[in-house]
Swiss-Prot record:
Region (Aspartate): 199-202
Residues annotated for L-aspartate binding in this entry: E175, R221, H450, R491
Entry's family note: Belongs to the class-II aminoacyl-tRNA synthetase family. Type 1 subfamily.
UniProt name for this protein: Aspartate--tRNA(Asp/Asn) ligase
Enzyme Commission identifier(s): 6.1.1.23
Encoding gene (name): aspS
InterPro entries found in the cross-reference section: Aa-tRNA-synt_II, aa-tRNA-synth_II, aa-tRNA-synth_II/BPL/LPL, Asp-tRNA-ligase_1, Asp-tRNA-ligase_1_N, Asp/Asn-tRNA-synth_IIb, AspRS_core, GAD-like_sf
Natural source organism: Nitrobacter hamburgensis (strain DSM 10229 / NCIMB 13809 / X14)
Described purpose of this protein according to its UniProt entry: Aspartyl-tRNA synthetase with relaxed tRNA specificity since it is able to aspartylate not only its cognate tRNA(Asp) but also tRNA(Asn). Reaction proceeds in two steps: L-aspartate is first activated by ATP to form Asp-AMP and then transferred to the acceptor end of tRNA(Asp/Asn).
Length: 590
């Protein structure tokens, strides 16, 4: 018999009755029922009930065991007594009568419980992550993550992609988020950077004659904490393709993403035919560029009904052509208590309030707005929104460029409060036609809106002759249930177009050469048309595991202060290490 086990703790069935077996694992739970000890023994594969009564030769040893001790148990498999079977366990028909116990690893008193899923302070969970990972839900999430990554790889290869690994030590770029810098010992005063993404390398691969690349790429960004991203590092399914247009990328990616979601959705419906929603339309209907399409509430422009009306606040706003009034339908929300609650919520979000109209049983409108604009305008709004008695509508007004984010939050809040969001499906969509540029109010200049390497729609002609703020890019995102899970674009592969694109954003050709010299040089030697994207592995796994916390799907994450509490990082280093790197510390004074 093997030194530690003949079977795993999830393997034994009623077909193993009367066999002598050996199991090794952790003491998950120990119970004393009238002098009979029941030990639930757990390993990676499952859990088996083991029994020692006073007649067992191992009873004295069993009495010494405590939670999370690692033990080897020898014994005989037998059927559980009638009525004590556990249908929730694959091993629930049998138990092991213990003949011998060997303690392989005793455990100190636990700083957090492994048995059960009770909430515990996050810092304790992260400091003792090796214990936290023994808990069933988190353990299963990590296993699911591995299976999802395997599925991604398999499906990418089925689409003709080949996996490459790009460098981890690369050059720093001042664009985007802050880099994690790595000092060079051999080149004093110079630094490598950990890649924020393999963007330039994957484009260089296309210029090197490769056709379809992918990798599960680690990415590093020295960003301030964000709720939707782990500090420090994250992983993405990165891909690039040569000689493609936007539709070719969509055709290659959709089967991969749809297939992964269908495989791990646990029966929940997954979008078959992805809609393509222009960026401007997404803001207009949903108040966000990552809409949750499970929410059926759609915003509409109702400016015409308030222009010249008796509600002077909106009427005066609409004298400025850039201002609009948007309505968010609230089916079933036509009570004063509900409308007042939404108004209070808006004030809590820093807004002056949230205007509303309610429709009574007779069909007449009620509320301050209805009283000011009159029954005809109120009825016209009801008909436009398709509402009925007992419903309400909520209104935001002003410059859409300034209020669309709040309008999107209000739409989401209404969907949640009215319980109209179907939580049991995955709604995937493409968001397309992103603006190439945006106006930076702080610096009073035109900036890139998203990826600076994207191809402008209309090419060099658009860059030369069009108002930059009207140029759209071949840039696209994948959204799912209110999250952006992937982003990409067709690349600007012509050097003259690349230089012009950066010039509009305030960078000269010398800046381009200095910051992106390797790729710019490659453009001079025959660059194919190419495009690609990257999908956030962490967010995909988070959605499929049914959690909203990225730490629940990551092995050893940092806390929100970018600290690894288990390993003690970041940490001090020795003066000798600093001298070797020619670094002297100049720390802020407390």
């Amino acid at each position: 018999m093997h030194r530690y086990r003949s079977h795993t703790c999830g393997a034994l069935r009623d077909s193993h009755i009367d066999q002598t077996v050996r199991l090794s694992g952790w003491c998950h739970r120990i119970r004393d029922h009238g002098g009979v000890l029941f030990i639930d023994l757990r390993d990676h594969y499952g859990l088996t009930q083991c029994v020692a009564d006073p007649d067992s030769p191992a009873f004295a040893q069993a009495e010494k065991l405590r939670s999370e001790w690692v033990v080897r148990i020898d014994g005989k498999a037998r059927l559980r007594p009638a009525g004590t079977e556990n249908p929730e366990l694959p091993t629930g028909q049998i138990e092991i009568y213990i003949n011998e116990i060997e303690v392989l690893g005793p455990a100190d008193e636990l700083p957090l419980p492994v048995f059960g899923e009770q909430e515990y302070p996050e810092d304790i969970r992260l400091k003792y992550r090796f214990l936290d990972l023994r808990r069933e839900k988190l353990h299963q999430n990590i296993m699911t993550r591995g299976a999802i990554v395997d599925s991604m790889r398999k499906r990418m290869k089925e689409q003709g992609f080949f996996e490459f690994q790009t460098p981890i030590l690369t050059a720093s770029s001042p664009e985007g988020a802050r880099d994690f810098l790595v000092p060079s010992r051999i080149h004093p005063g110079k630094f490598y950077a950990l890649p924020q993404a393999p963007q330039q390398y994957k484009q260089l691969l296309m210029m090197s004659g490769f056709d379809r690349y992918f990798q599960i790429a680690p990415c590093f960004r020295d960003e301030d904490p964000r709720a939707d991203r782990l500090p420090g590092e994250f992983y993405q399914l990165d891909l690039e393709m040569s000689f493609v247009e936007q539709d070719d990328v969509f055709a290659a990616v959709e089967p991969v993403v749809t297939g992964v979601f269908e495989e791990f959705a646990k029966g929940k419906p997954v979008t078959k035919n992805w809609p393509r929603i222009p960026f401007a339309e997404s803001l207009r209907k949903y108040g966000t560029d990552k809409p949750d399409l499970r929410n059926p509430l759609l915003m509409q422009d109702v400016s015409q009904h308030f222009r010249g009306s008796g509600f002077k606040v909106f009427a005066r706003m609409l004298e400025d052509s850039k201002n609009q009034v948007w309505a968010i339908p609230g089916p079933g929300g036509g009570s004063r208590a509900f409308c007042d609650r939404m108004n209070s919520w808006a004030q809590g979000e820093g807004q002056p309030g949230l205007g509303y109209i309610m429709w009574r049983e007779g069909g007449e409108g009620a509320g301050p707005l209805a009283n000011n604009i009159g029954p005809e305008r109120t009825e016209a709004i009801r008909q436009q929104l398709g509402l009925k008695a007992g419903d309400a509508a909520f209104f935001v007004a002003g410059d859409p460029a300034k209020f669309w984010k709040f309008a999107g939050l209000a739409r989401t809040k209404l969907g949640e409060e009215l319980n109209v969001i179907d939580k049991d499906r995955f709604e995937l969509a493409w968001i397309v036609d992103f603006p190439m540029y945006e106006y930076n109010e702080d610096e009073k200049k035109v900036d890139f809106s998203h990826n600076p390497f994207s191809m402008p729609q209309g090419g060099l002609d658009a860059l030369n002759n069009q108002d930059p703020l009207t140029i759209k890019a071949f840039q696209y995102d994948i959204t799912c249930n209110g999250y952006e899970i992937a982003s990409g674009g067709i690349r600007n592969h012509r050097p003259e177009a690349m230089v012009k694109a950066f010039e509009i954003a305030g960078y000269g050709e010398n800046d381009v050469v200095e910051r992106f010299g390797g790729m710019y040089r490659a453009f001079q030697y025959g660059a194919p048309p190419h495009g690609g994207m990257a999908a956030g592995v962490d967010r995909v796994v988070m959605l499929l595991c049914g959690t909203t916390n990225l730490r629940e799907i990551s092995l050893f994450p940092m806390n929100q202060r970018a600290e690894d509490l288990l390993m003690g990082a970041p940490s001090d280093v020795t003066p000798k290490q600093l001298r070797e790197l020619h670094i002297r510390l100049n720390l802020p004074q407390d």
